[in-house]
Amino acid sequence: MATIKDVAKMAGVSTTTVSHVINKTRFVAKDTEEAVLSAIKQLNYSPSAVARSLKVNTTKSIGMIVTTSEAPYFAEIIHSVEEHCYRQGYSLFLCNTQNDPEKVKNHLEMLAKKRVDGLLVMCSEYTQDSLDLLSSFSTIPMVVMDWGPNANTDVIDDHSFDGGYLATKHLIECGHKKIGIICGELNKTTARTRYEGFEKAMEEAKLTINPSWVLEGAFEPEDGYECMNRLLTQEELPTALFCCNDVMALGAISALTEKCLRVPEDMSIIGYDDIHASRFYAPPLTTIHQSKLRLGRQAVNILLERITHKDEGVQQYSRIDITPELIIRKSVKSIL
């Protein structure tokens, strides 16, 4: 691997001159600059990123810690973050934690050693222990995005209550009165608020919620599949079902298909998140859209602002508002 000394020797100049050409820190005569650039090209020389970062106090890199990059919703946010980082001249180090506290700690230590310019933390839920751990790395500019009510983090307000209400209202407006729900784990903020939106819409329409049609599971396709199979053991079935995320809806549709039941002819289904794949479900899924692109971009912009002003004291926590929108496709049937 070529060194700066090799470049200087080939160009017939000092290493200091090579450094000035690379970093544009001093005027260098045109012919000298061309000789240096020619030597760099011939030798395929690349300046040491570590050495440069020590000199200019930046690595142009950002660390991102997420619960998982496998879930389509998070994957689409990560894609948006990576793309926006790239356009701003930053590399992204992605770390999956799988909600393992030891992994969180190890990833934070590794990213600190790599001298990342900032940290973006995006997990589905936070414990006090995890928040305390993050605070111990407070010398690094950081954006901790939280869907919950914690006071010591930035907040993503995805208006899940409104989204749950909007989804249920659409089913009601299509004539459905027997409506079930496959919700997430109700001890978690996002699932609970979507369920509360469902409750509100049912209450407004003076419709009774059948407790047997309220099924709880994780935001995974397997849980949607298992919940639907439990629902199908009942004598009376709902005409419509609100699945509180799209991958649960996929699992639910799979279970229906195995029983030779059709969507929406035998049961209407509405999802939530509008992941990219949802338009290719069979049938294409009616769902609630959240802008993952906007969320990723805004989170990066907040972090870059903190990196720029990191020496100016404590930063105020930020809030990102994501407005839910109804996307009508083919999985809900009107029975009016």
Curated annotation (Swiss-Prot):
Consists of two structural and functional domains: an N-terminal DNA-binding domain, approximately the first 60 residues, and a larger C-terminal domain, approximately 280 residues, which imparts the function of corepressor binding and oligomerization. It comes from Haemophilus influenzae (strain PittGG). Pfam families: LacI, Peripla_BP_3. Hypoxanthine binds at residues 73, 188, 190, 219, 273. One of its GO terms (biological process) is purine nucleotide biosynthetic process. Residues 2-56 form the HTH lacI-type domain. Homodimer. Residues 4-23, 48-56 bind DNA. The keyword Aminoacyl-tRNA synthetase does not apply. SMART domains: HTH_LACI. Is the main repressor of the genes involved in the de novo synthesis of purine nucleotides, regulating purB, purC, purEK, purF, purHD, purL, purMN and guaBA expression. PurR is allosterically activated to bind its cognate DNA by binding the purine corepressors, hypoxanthine or guanine, thereby effecting transcription repression. Keywords: DNA-binding, Purine biosynthesis, Repressor, Transcription, Transcription regulation. GO terms for molecular function: DNA-binding transcription factor activity; transcription cis-regulatory region binding. Pathway: Purine metabolism; purine nucleotide biosynthesis [regulation]. This is HTH-type transcriptional repressor PurR.
